[in-house]
Regions:
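Glycan-processing catalytic domains of CAZymes
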Residues: 1-192
Length: 192
C-alpha cells in the first residue's frame, strides 16, 4: 500500500495525461512540476538503500531499474512532455524518489544516473525546462534532526549534493535550472 497515492491516477492512459496537460493550459497553468519519476517510500537515516539494491518503481520505461508502477499509461512522462511542447508549456522534471529528505552521497549518485537517463530519453523536448529534486527538505536544511552532529551532517550533505548535482547536470544540459522544494518552517536555522 502506497500512502498518498490517488488510485484514479493509476487508471489514466497516455491520452488522458495529454488531455490533462491541455486542460491545465486552458486554465493558464503553463508550468508543471512532475513530483517524482520513481516511487520509493523510504526516509533518510532509516534505510540501507544504495544504487545497486534500489527497489523503487518507475513511472516511465527506465533502463536503470526494472521495477514499474502499476499504471495504465505506457509512458506518462513522454505523453506529458510531448503535449506540453505543443501547448508551449514548461515542465520541471522530477528526479526522484531515492528516499525522502536524503541528500547523502549514495542519493547523489542515484540522482546523477536518473537525471542523465531522463535527459537522454526526454531532453529533446522543448518543454523540458528544469530538473526538480523530489526529496524535499525542511526549511532549516537539517530535516529536523535532533543531535547537533547529525544536523550538521544533513546540512553538509545537502550543500554538497546540490553543488555536485548542478555541476553534473550542467555537463549535459547547460543552463537548465535545478529546483528543490523546501518548506518554510525553520528557515533561519538553515542560514549558517
Amino acid at each position: 500500500q502506497v500512502k498518498h497515492w490517488n488510485q484514479d491516477i493509476k487508471k489514466m492512459t497516455d491520452n488522458q495525461w495529454r488531455e490533462l496537460v491541455r486542460s491545465m493550459n486552458k486554465l493558464d497553468m503553463n508550468m508543471m512540476v512532475i513530483q517524482e519519476v520513481f516511487r520509493n517510500e523510504q526516509y533518510v537515516g532509516k534505510h540501507s538503500t544504495n544504487v545497486d539494491n534500489y527497489q523503487g518503481k518507475a513511472f516511465y520505461p527506465s533502463k536503470l531499474y526494472p521495477g514499474r508502477m502499476d499504471i495504465a499509461a505506457k509512458d506518462p512522462i513522454e505523453a506529458i512532455l510531448s503535449e506540453a511542447d505543443k501547448q508551449g508549456m514548461n515542465v520541471l522534471m522530477g528526479v526522484g524518489m531515492f528516499a525522502w529528505f536524503d541528500f547523502t552521497p549514495e542519493s547523489l549518485e542515484w540522482h546523477k544516473r536518473v537525471a542523465k537517463e531522463l535527459w537522454d530519453m526526454y531532453g529533446h523536448h522543448e518543454s523540458f525546462y528544469a530538473f526538480y529534486v523530489s526529496e524535499e527538505s525542511g526549511g532549516g536544511l537539517d530535516n529536523w534532526e535532533q543531535l547537533p552532529e547529525i544536523r550538521k551532517k544533513r546540512k553538509d550533505d545537502i550543500v554538497n549534493f546540490f553543488k555536485e548535482f548542478k555541476a553534473y547536470c550542467n555537463s549535459f544540459a547547460p543552463g537548465k535550472p535545478v529546483m528543490l522544494a523546501t518548506n518554510s518552517f525553520e528557515v533561519p536555522n538553515g542560514m549558517d
